[in-house]
Amino acid sequence: MSNARRLNDGMGAYVANQTIKCMNKKGVMVKNARILILGITFKENCPDIRNTKVVDIYHTLEEYTHRITVYDPWADKDHVMHEYGIDVTNELPEEKYDAVILAVAHREFAGLDVKGLVKENGVVYDVKGFLDRDLVDGRL
């Protein structure tokens, strides 16, 4: 396997672990934390879930907590459940999270108040460099 492929295959775990590090730095209890992942599709503004690396982020986070919500207005939730066994919501939950990971830069996320989605010392991690730097605790 090529080095580029190996690097790409490890990116999901890397993102999850970087988010966990940000949470630890801010004193957020990781065990049983509530985490919101924004987006699960392979790319933005598209319903295709084939080859998505967001699944790897999800499964790495499961080592720490099972309180993970995936919100994606583009994904077919039945298809995601069938392919990956992950429950996806197409409606943004009105809850506060310990961490929010912007994984896919859907246009619906452009006007989203991400700071309003996290608890007082919650973490925002931006995988796509989509959000204003002042709003995020970490980015890829």
Labelled PLM ranges:
Residues 1-140:
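Structural/interface elements that position substrates and couple domains in central-metabolism enzymes
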